[in-house]
């Protein structure tokens, strides 16, 4: 009898969940409710009553499970099942036609079907459903790893907690955003100095709020548009995916359309651009996807984005404001940058007060003067940029920039190569250059030292150790201490700051006592101190742990961190994929560097110059003494030395189903293959993907070099 009663209660709960889920979809997604708010609220309360009485029957996808007031997020990093790649850009019809021509080479037809989608200006999200139940939600992160925000995602009522599918595991991607109407209402209710800069930042910040109950109040929404492995799951076209997402109850942008050719699509695309301000959500362009999945693998990918889709960037909105001043800054490489300080102006949903002026030549060519009224756009919808001057409004007090060709920080003479437009400070002791380099070194993409923000680094960089010691000793002398304490000994070097170089970062722990001052008398206010670093013992220990963790970063990060001209993360990865120990770079020639994949002669010369300088090797040796990792460990158990590919030289050309960097890394580790950039008699194999360079293929044939056209990295 009890079993029957329990079965009946279970069925009642399931029926209530089914009803409420249907009504939520009608109200939040379709904007067409079939029941009144009163009916919904009463049913919700009824379900809540049953769930409290019979918690063993609570369903994970019940509407009551969207918000748990006691939940807090930890934002654990999780690897994506499929890379979250960015998209290539185009800006006009001609570039769109070029995109179509590349597709046509594969499809063998002039007219190709495309899906046009609005490019939502929000935060990318990847949902994972297991047996139809929402189980995980990840942000884009770096495209390889994202942060889990599942608790916060569940608060968005347009996202179904359960979908009707027999697929065991499915990944569904979309964009979290806030409507224009809701964003304006939210900002209207806030004080002037607490208003959100733009809707995208608001959505991003909300989704990363640790308080789930607070997120539930944020009025977030989401659109969905993509299943990364749709073809494997039996879908044949992108438009079929869109229709299925609608059927499953996902919010899908009404503006998504299917076209039989690129010219038809372009007409509708321009209509979308002209009407973008009439939408109740912000878009920064449109996405064009080739509709037929069967050709995707053949069309392939670059190292950064798929070649079967492209983002069309709309012409930027132009506004006018007054240029109040021109600020000169020195970057980590010594490059001088020119920044316009502006009268605040709203542009594309953001309040703009600064914009780039590129370089001195740009300023002179446009005759930009302080106090001028200038035209402003967002370059690629992100970076504010001054594009011209309203000469009709030029005021009498407009004045040209006084440029004395000296560094604004150290006042040493600037230099410029005849073939370049940028001016550089080459003085090694330039304070601003040193600080910018330290900020770069500690940044997330490089050595990823959490706790050393720009402001904290600036404080450590500018504060003399002896000044802090004197303040501490004064506190001890005045008996503002909780224990008997000897005076701290002054350093011999009066000019020594806490962090003057990257080496000092790894020795910060020795200053713990004078930084956090745990010996201060209880109740003493640190706010009265002249030198207050705002660290408690726990936060300082966390910083030291992060510094120690940075010692074990991958080799490519260290290579990028060495501040070598023209060397960014992509080039550093290319080097580390071939040479797994920094010491191997000591005796390389320019030609050796040029043989590496994707490295130009300019970059090769820069690398050769850096690693030929004994001063730089002194720094590397000092880093080694501090236990900084300078090599990638190779697991010899995974190396296949019996393969015909072992220890051979390869040239890679064309596009592949995964990025070229990933291929190079896998093959370098598995077979110790060395990748070079050009085909010569010294090359053993050419690995060719889709649309390989004809010249390289022809050279390989002439030299009888075997051409591989299979995925040997998966063997």
Swiss-Prot record:
Domain BRCT, first and last residues per copy: 640-715
Annotated SUPFAM superfamilies: BRCT domain, DNA ligase/mRNA capping enzyme, catalytic domain, Nucleic acid-binding proteins, RuvA domain 2-like
CDD domains hit by this protein: BRCT_DNA_ligase_like, LIGANc
Residue sites binding NAD(+) per the record: 37-41, 86-87, 117, 140, 175, 289, 313
BP terms from Gene Ontology: DNA repair; DNA replication
Reactions accelerated catalytically: NAD(+) + (deoxyribonucleotide)n-3'-hydroxyl + 5'-phospho-(deoxyribonucleotide)m = (deoxyribonucleotide)n+m + AMP + beta-nicotinamide D-nucleotide
E.C. code: 6.5.1.2
Broad EC category: ligase
Pfam families: BRCT, DNA_ligase_aden, DNA_ligase_OB, DNA_ligase_ZBD, HHH_2
SMART domains hit by this protein: LIGANc
Record-level Gene Ontology MF annotations: DNA ligase (NAD+) activity; metal ion binding
Cofactor(s) demanded: Mg(2+); Mn(2+)
Keywords: DNA damage, DNA repair, DNA replication, Ligase, Magnesium, Manganese, Metal-binding, NAD, Zinc
Active site: 119
Superkingdom to which the source organism belongs: Bacteria
Record InterPro entries: BRCT_dom, BRCT_dom_sf, DisA/LigA_HHH, DNA_ligase, DNA_ligase_CS, DNAligase_adenylation, DNAligase_N, NA-bd_OB-fold
Binding-site positions, Zn(2+): 407, 410, 425, 430
Role summary: DNA ligase that catalyzes the formation of phosphodiester linkages between 5'-phosphoryl and 3'-hydroxyl groups in double-stranded DNA using NAD as a coenzyme and as the energy source for the reaction. It is essential for DNA replication and repair of damaged DNA.
Protein family according to the UniProt entry: Belongs to the NAD-dependent DNA ligase family. LigA subfamily.
Name of this chain's protein: DNA ligase
Organism: Mycoplasmoides gallisepticum (strain R(low / passage 15 / clone 2)) (Mycoplasma gallisepticum)
Lineage: Bacteria, Bacillati, Mycoplasmatota, Mycoplasmoidales, Mycoplasmoidaceae
